[in-house]
A protein has these predicted regions:
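Secretory targeting and sorting signals
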Residues: 1-27
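Active-site mouth of glycoside hydrolases
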Residues: 33-49, 53-252, 257-265
Length: 470
C-alpha cells in the first residue's frame, strides 16, 4: 500500500471545510449503523468476514502468483480468519489483446482450492496500482494504456503521487470513455466470472482496485473525485456488473470509491443496478501512511465513519472494507488505533480484509516466524462468522476478552457459527435460551468454529469468555 503524502497537499482548504461539515455528527457519537444491510449467504445467514489481502505483486508470467502459497491460507485459518482478498492482474490474465492466459487462470484456481481446503471465502480483486505496467506497476495491460503523449515522471519515494501525473490520469480517462477499452474490460470480467462462478471458495468480485481519474483545470481533488465517481465509475461499475452477471448470477460484486474517501469525504458514486452489490472502501489515513503515529485527538476515525456510511445507507447495500492497516504498527499510539479502528469497523461493516498477509516487515501481518507483528494480534478476536437469525447485539470487550452475541433465531437451514482464535486460556461458551452446541469449551492454543443451533423464533444469547489457563 502506498504512502499518500500527496493527497493532503492537493485537497487543501476544501477538505478542511468538508471535515468541519461532518464534525457535528462525529461529536454526537458513532454513526448509527441502522439502515446498512448485512452481508448474507445463500441460506440467509448474516455473515461477518475477517481476513487479509493476499498478493504477489513481484512475479509475472510463468512465476505469476507464485509468492502465494497454501501456507497463507492454513496460517490465516489457524488464527480464526475466514476471508481473503486475492489480488489478480489484468496484465497477467490478458498480456496480449484477446489472448487470455490459461496458465494464469489455473494459478488462480489452485489458490482458490487452497482457500476451500481451509474454509476461507475469497474476493477476487482486479488490482491496479498507478494504472499498470506502462508506468512501472501492475494492473491494466500496456496494450490498453493510452496517454495521448502526455508526460509521466516516476516518483519512487512517493509512488502514490504518480496517480497525478498527466499520462496516468489520461490513461484512466481512456479506460472509462473509449468504447473498445470498455468492451475489453467487460470481456476480461466475463472470462473470470465464467471460470470461477461455481468455485465454492468464491464470494465475489472486486471490479477494480482504488480507481482514480483525470482532474480538470481549476478543479480541486474532492470535486474531481465526486465527478469521477458519479460520471465515470458509476457507469463503469454498471457495465462490469452486467458483464459478470452474463456468466455468474450468484456471487457478490464489490465496488470501490476513489481512495479520497480515506480523507473523510463522502463518495459521489451513484446507484449500481445489481441485486448483490457490496460497497468496499479502503480505510487509510494519509498521515499514518507517511509514517506518523495515530493522533486520537484528530477525530479521523469518527470523520471517516460518518462519511463512509452515508452511501451504503442511501443505497441499502452492505459494507466490507477491502484494505486497511498502518505501515508503522508499533508506534506509541498504535495499540489504541487498532482498538478504536476495530470497534469502528464492527459498528457499520460486514467485515474487512487487512493489508496484507505476508511474512516479514512493513505492512505484513506476521513476521518470518508466523507470529503477529506488534498490535496486529488485536485483529484475531472472536466473531460471529454466520448468524442463523436476526442479530440483536454483537459485542466484544478486548479488555476482558468476552464476546457476546444476541440474536433471534430463524427457521433457515444452517447453524450460527462463532469463530474463535487460539487463546492461551482456551474458551468457555455459555448459552441462554433454547439453544445447544456440541462445543461448550475450546482447549487452549486452538482456533475453533463453534456451531450453535436454536429454536426458531427464540432469542438466543451466546457468551464466549476466556477459559482457565493451563
Amino acid at each position: 500500500m502506498p504512502t499518500r503524502r500527496t493527497i493532503p497537499l492537493l485537497i487543501g482548504t476544501c477538505l478542511l471545510l468538508l471535515l468541519a461539515a461532518v464534525a457535528p455528527a462525529s461529536a454526537a457519537g458513532p454513526s448509527d449503523p441502522a439502515g446498512i444491510p448485512r452481508l448474507t449467504d445463500d441460506r440467509g445467514r448474516t455473515l461477518t468476514l475477517r481476513g487479509w489481502n493476499v498478493e504477489d505483486k513481484t512475479n509475472r508470467g510463468d512465476r505469476a502468483l507464485s509468492a502465494i502459497t497454501e501456507k497463507h491460507f492454513r496460517d490465516m485459518r489457524a488464527q480464526g480468519f475466514n476471508f481473503a482478498r486475492l489480488l489478480v492482474f489484468w496484465d497477467d490474465l490478458e498480456p496480449r489483446r484477446g489472448q487470455y492466459s490459461a496458465a494464469y487462470l489455473c494459478k488462480i484456481e489452485r489458490i482458490l482450492d487452497w482457500a476451500e481446503t481451509y474454509d476461507i471465502q475469497v474476493l477476487i480483486d482486479s488490482h491496479q496500482d498507478v494504472f499498470g505496467p506502462a508506468f512501472g506497476h501492475r494492473g491494466i495491460p500496456e496494450w490498453a494504456t493510452r496517454t495521448d503523449g502526455l508526460p509521466f515522471t516516476p516518483h519512487p519515494d512517493d509512488w502514490f503521487s504518480e496517480y497525478f501525473e498527466p499520462a496516468v490520469q489520461r490513461a484512466f480517462t481512456h479506460l472509462y470513455e473509449d468504447e473498445d477499452l470498455r468492451r475489453a474490460q467487460a470481456r476480461m470480467w466475463r472470462v473470470i466470472a465464467d471460470r470461477f462462478e461455481h468455485h465454492p471458495a468464491v464470494l465475489g468480485y472486486d471490479l477494480i482496485n482504488e480507481p482514480m481519474g483525470e482532474l480538470r483545470a481549476g478543479e480541486d481533488l474532492p470535486a474531481a473525485a465526486r465527478r469521477i465517481e458519479r460520471y465515470q465509475l458509476t457507469p463503469m461499475y454498471n457495465r462490469l456488473a452486467d458483464a459478470v452477471r452474463s456468466a455468474d448470477d450468484g456471487n457478490w460484486v464489490f465496488v470501490e470509491p476513489t481512495p479520497i474517501v480515506g480523507e473523510g469525504l463522502p463518495t459521489g458514486l451513484g446507484r449500481i443496478k445489481d441485486p448483490k452489490v457490496v460497497y468496499a472502501p479502503h480505510f487509510y489515513n494519509t498521515a499514518m501512511e507517511a509514517g506518523a503515529d495515530y493522533d486520537p485527538s484528530a477525530g479521523w476515525i469518527e470523520s471517516y465513519e460518518a462519511a463512509v456510511t452515508a452511501y451504503p445507507k442511501e443505497q441499502r447495500i452492505p459494507v466490507v472494507v477491502g484494505e486497511w492497516g498502518p505501515l508503522n504498527n508499533s508506534l506509541p499510539n498504535m495499540g489504541r488505533f487498532y482498538r478504536e479502528a476495530l470497534a469502528s469497523l464492527n459498528r457499520y461493516s460486514s467485515g474487512w480484509a487487512g493489508y496484507v498477509w505476508c511474512y516479514g516487515g512493513g505492512y505484513c501481518a506476521v513476521d518470518e516466524r508466523g507470529l503477529f507483528r506488534t498490535n496486529k494480534e488485536q485483529t484475531a478476536a472472536p466473531y460471529a462468522a454466520a448468524v442463523a437469525g436476526r442479530v440483536v447485539a454483537d459485542t466484544y470487550d478486548p479488555g476482558s476478552g468476552t464476546y457476546r452475541l444476541v440474536y433471534r433465531a430463524h427457521g433457515w437451514r444452517g447453524a450460527t457459527e462463532i469463530s474463535l482464535p487460539p487463546s492461551a486460556s482456551g474458551w468457555r461458551i455459555a448459552l441462554d435460551g433454547p439453544a445447544w452446541t456440541d462445543t461448550p469449551t475450546v482447549p487452549a492454543g486452538r482456533a475453533c468454529t463453534v456451531r450453535v443451533r436454536g429454536l426458531p423464533g427464540a432469542q438466543i444469547t451466546v457468551t464466549v469468555s476466556p477459559g482457565t489457563p493451563r
